[in-house]
């Protein structure tokens, strides 16, 4: 499989790591689970994500989307290829104050989103204990909520639209999410 991974790496604009050090860094999240991935991909473009999905399908391995890795339940730990979208998919794309929504990429940090929204008198309600590093893609994947969820509900209840990559083997990698925001 190492030769196939080498060939894949040559086709990506982003990075693909399969050395022990990087795999060790991604073998855990904030949970107590530990499993070494086959490789770690840091895609730079949507085309990179398409190539990763095709590779995983051809070689019958899994893709595990990951942002900050703050989950306490091991959702982003596995023996497939970790796809870390936090580095290059981290932009706030559009704000519509009138309709009360914002479109973001999955690597946007929840607290940084609220800092962006604050001057507009708006905020994104769902909160986690790791809101200063939790990213929207992970919050969507985990349906995050927190101590204020009684008032502001969970993440899924704020989700209007998700643009994602899908494959016939069930891979879903979110590339943008449109979420509702609340006036202060």
Where are these regions (language model features)?
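Low-complexity, simple-sequence tandem-repeat tracts enriched in small residues
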Residues: 181-182
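Conserved PLP cofactor-binding pocket of PLP-dependent enzymes
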Residues: 66
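A short, glycine/Asx- and small/polar-enriched loop/turn
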Residues: 34-35, 76-81
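N-terminal glycine-rich flavin-associated loop
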Residues: 8, 31-63, 85-128, 140, ...
């Amino acid at each position: 499989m190492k030769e196939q991974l080498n060939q894949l790496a040559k086709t990506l604009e982003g990075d693909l790591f399969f050395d022990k050090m990087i795999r060790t860094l991604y073998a855990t999240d904030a949970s107590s689970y530990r499993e070494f991935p086959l490789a770690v991909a840091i895609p730079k473009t949507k085309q990179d994500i398409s190539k990763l999905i095709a590779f995983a399908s051809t070689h019958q391995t899994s893709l595990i989307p990951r942002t900050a890795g703050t989950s306490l339940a091991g959702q982003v730990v596995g023996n497939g290829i970790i796809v870390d979208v936090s580095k290059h998919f981290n932009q706030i794309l559009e704000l519509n104050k009138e309709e009360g929504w914002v479109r973001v990429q999955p690597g946007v940090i929840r607290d940084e989103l609220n800092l962006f929204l604050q001057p507009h008198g708006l905020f994104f309600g769902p909160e986690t204990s790791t809101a200063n590093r939790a990213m929207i893609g992970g919050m969507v994947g985990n349906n995050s909520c927190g101590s204020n969820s009684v008032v502001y509900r969970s993440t899924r209840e704020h989700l209007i639209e998700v643009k994602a990559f899908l494959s016939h083997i069930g891979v879903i990698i979110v590339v943008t999410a449109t979420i509702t925001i609340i006036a202060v």
